[in-house]
Amino acid sequence: VYGEGTAVLAGDALLTDAFMLAASAELRRPKDIALAIGILAHNAGSLGMVGGQMLDIDSEHRQLTEQEVYDVQSRKTVALINAACVLGVIAGGGSAKQLQAAAEFATHIGLAFQIRDDILDVIGDQSQLGKAIGADEAKNTFLRIYGIEKCKELVATLTEKAIRSLDAFEDHSYMRELAQSLVSRMM
């Protein structure tokens, strides 16, 4: 079992490993390596996952506004998904238009994923999810602000926006199916 300090050290090690992998990637152009490291730093740092976690911790004892919940989730879930999507386009030699499309896709699908996760914390089955249900009850979530029905509508709307952003890619059938699976996912 990890203690709090051990989990932080493991996270630090993973972040360092991510930068090492980005720096040693066999990309076609040196500027792609620099771009990849910049994307990773942005999505991991104070404007990304680390900053989002700090906002989340700082807000544990007060109710956040809609914008504040958006800010937290944009820096956490969305930043993680953004890094994965955009780094994939860089590694694949994608165009500037595809980089922009990947970032737009990540923004919409990241929010949809997080909102669906919040819904599943209330209506999900612990054995299917693999985590305790109701753990986020006191947390600042979109579900707390909007309720289940509005959140289901948001997941569908955000998913459709994500899918529309995929037009910059020649073959996006897999990503389209993946995005659509979020609307009804139970795990």
Can you say where each PLM-predicted feature lies in the sequence?
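All-alpha prenyltransferase/terpene-synthase fold signal
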Residues: 1-187
